[in-house]
């Protein structure tokens, strides 16, 4: 099965990032083949704490938090891409909630 990296730039998404991570966790694509890379632009809210809590509670999903030093979406995407290890890259926004089969459909479409 093909490895997929989901890259997510974010900034101050404490109210939405858990919903996104839960939706990624519940994807029909096998969790063992998904890596999530979140590029945080030095959030001033609890975004990092929410991500850390999700990581502790869901060790079966590889979630990595990296710094977006320039605090811009392009910089965040580049930082996430640098940390990504998947053969396929899927980009999501931190405030999105993808359908359960979103990753599977992306992979099948390639």
Tell where the protein language model's regions lie, with residue ranges.
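Cell-envelope/extracellular polymer assembly enzymes that use nucleotide-activated donors
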Residues: 3-5, 35
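Short, acidic, metal-binding catalytic loop of nucleotide-sugar glycosyltransferases
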Residues: 22-33
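Short beta-strand/loop segment that forms part of the nucleotide-sugar
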Residues: 33-42, 64-68
């Amino acid at each position: 099965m093909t490895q997929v990296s989901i890259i997510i730039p974010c900034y101050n998404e404490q109210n939405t990032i858990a919903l996104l991570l839960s939706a990624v966790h519940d994807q029909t694509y096998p969790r063992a083949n998904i890596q999530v890379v979140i590029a945080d632009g030095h959030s001033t809210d609890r975004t990092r704490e929410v991500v850390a809590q999700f990581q502790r509670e869901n060790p079966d999903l590889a979630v990595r938090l990296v710094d977006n030093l320039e605090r811009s979406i392009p910089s965040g995407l580049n930082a996430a891409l640098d940390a990504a290890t998947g053969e396929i890259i899927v980009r999501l926004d931190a405030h999105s909630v993808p359908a359960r089969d979103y990753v599977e459909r992306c992979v099948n479409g390639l």
